[in-house]
């Protein structure tokens, strides 16, 4: 437990993005845990931004993530149809701004052409194998998705199955899956 939060650490979620077969799918589970307690099982941590042209998912402190999503929306308005540029500008602000520097969250964002992970360390990472995952069950979901990429399964089927596997292993991930899909280039 921290001195500021008597309930312990907030653990929340698994988010995965899969790009395959002309589709990009982002999926997230719905669990929010506070310490050893499941506070909510149907949270929506994957959503559309920028008039539906961008999908975003977050892991970490919810209020921090919403702050970052709002800032990303502003960057997308400044740099329309330039997700990479908007993400880099957000990461620069996140790293250098005294207030933003303390935000505890990670984000995955995707549009028709690119998928990115954005961190508070100033990282903007593009996956090389068509999939990337974050959050408490991110490594499990990522490994499962990588194993399924060579099968005949669709991007949606891979994302859903990867989250199911993560939910079977990670106590901070449940099986309430929310999916968003875009046509990819």
UniProtKB/Swiss-Prot annotation:
Quote the catalytic residue positions.
13
Say yes or no: keyword rRNA-binding present.
no
Which Pfam families does the record associate with it? Proteasome
Q: What keywords would UniProt list here?
A: Allosteric enzyme, Cytoplasm, Hydrolase, Metal-binding, Protease, Sodium, Threonine protease
Q: Which SUPFAM superfamilies match?
A: N-terminal nucleophile aminohydrolases (Ntn hydrolases)
From its record, what is one biological process in GO terms? Answer: proteolysis involved in protein catabolic process
Q: Where does Na(+) bind?
A: 167, 170, 173
Question: How might one describe the regulation of this protein's activity?
Answer: Allosterically activated by HslU binding.
The record's family statement is: Belongs to the peptidase T1B family. HslV subfamily.
Q: What is this protein called?
A: ATP-dependent protease subunit HslV
What organism does this protein naturally occur in? Sinorhizobium medicae (strain WSM419)
- Species classification: Bacteria, Pseudomonadati, Pseudomonadota, Alphaproteobacteria, Hyphomicrobiales
Gene name linked to the record = hslV
């Amino acid at each position: 437990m921290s001195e500021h939060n008597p309930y312990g650490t907030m653990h929340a979620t698994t988010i995965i993005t899969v790009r395959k077969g002309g589709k990009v799918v982002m999926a997230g589970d719905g669990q929010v845990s506070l310490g050893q307690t499941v506070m909510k099982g149907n949270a929506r941590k994957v959503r559309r931004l920028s008039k539906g042209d961008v999908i975003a998912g977050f892991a970490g402190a919810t209020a921090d993530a919403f702050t970052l999503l709002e800032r990303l929306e502003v960057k997308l308005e400044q740099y329309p149809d330039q997700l990479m540029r908007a993400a880099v500008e957000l990461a620069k602000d996140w790293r250098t701004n005294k207030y933003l520097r303390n935000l505890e969250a990670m984000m995955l964002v995707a549009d028709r052409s690119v998928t990115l992970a954005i961190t508070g360390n100033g990282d903007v990472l593009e996956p090389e194998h068509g999939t990337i995952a974050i959050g408490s069950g991110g490594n499990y979901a990522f490994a499962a998705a990588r194993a399924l990429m060579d099968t005949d399964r669709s991007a949606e089927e891979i994302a859903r199955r990867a989250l199911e596997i993560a939910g079977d292993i990670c106590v901070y991930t449940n099986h309430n899956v929310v999916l968003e899909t875009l046509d990819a280039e």
